[in-house]
Amino acid sequence: MAIANKNIIFVAGLGGIGLDTSREIVKSGPKNLVILDRIDNPTAIAELKAINPKVTVTFYPYDVTVPVAETTKLLKTIFAQLKTVDLLINGAGILDDHQIERTIAVNFTGTVNTTTAIMEFWDKRKGGPGGVIANICSVTGFNAIYQVPVYSASKAAALSFTNSLARLAPITGVTAYSINPGITRTPLVHRFNSWLDVEPRVGELLLEHPTQTTLECAQNFVKAIEANKNGAIWQLDLGQLIAVEWTKHWDSHI
């Protein structure tokens, strides 16, 4: 999907990977970039507007843990202004296995709820035009960082949800793919809590191995958006974009 002249909603578009991705997106010339984030960052919004003044960049405060009804209300406001939305990026995430309930609420339930809410506007069974969803998951959804099992499990759940969305596209008209970054040098991984403090140095240990920058990840993210492949499982690791071939071990046959 060419980004030029598209309307894009980016949940958590002001974080580490999120902000660099927002920068790369505005360079590609969408018509509108709507950023939904828990924390306002006027400086970042001003920077995005300055990168490409032809792009309309707007911000709405948003916490992905709110009920679906509240998200739907916010989306009604956005759709009323834009008329159409082409792409939803679900990017909210936390890495802190001390916060078990919040990790699941942000990393998994929030993605499900935001997706559920936008279906009210996109689902072709309701007369909607369809749309595209890019869910930011993680390579830990493939193989866990076992010292942070709650985080890893939440990302595996988000990946499974995304794979199902892609299979449902013939019914809903909404396509989906997952973005799975490897270890990326962001504040998220510099220091974080392992589950039950099983490894207090887990963040430091990860950074002793090869990593990637947020810019490298963001540039490959834009390439994945442009590829627009329904059901794709994109691995963004060490500056490379790799299409993962998922191994099927079981099938429901329905």
UniProtKB/Swiss-Prot annotation:
The active site is at 151 (proton acceptor). The keyword Ubl conjugation does not apply. GO terms for molecular function: alcohol dehydrogenase (NAD+) activity. It comes from the Eukaryota. Pfam families: adh_short. It is an enzyme of class 1 (oxidoreductase). Substrate binds at residue 138. Keywords: NAD, Oxidoreductase. GO terms for cellular component: cytoplasm. InterPro entries: ADH_Drosophila-type, NAD(P)-bd_dom_sf, Sc_DH/Rdtase_CS, SDR_fam. Its EC number is 1.1.1.1. NAD(+) binds at residues 10-33. Gene3D superfamilies: NAD(P)-binding Rossmann-like Domain (3.40.50.720). GO terms for biological process: alcohol metabolic process. It catalyses: a primary alcohol + NAD(+) = an aldehyde + NADH + H(+); a secondary alcohol + NAD(+) = a ketone + NADH + H(+). Homodimer. Belongs to the short-chain dehydrogenases/reductases (SDR) family. This is Alcohol dehydrogenase. It comes from Drosophila flavomontana. The gene is Adh.
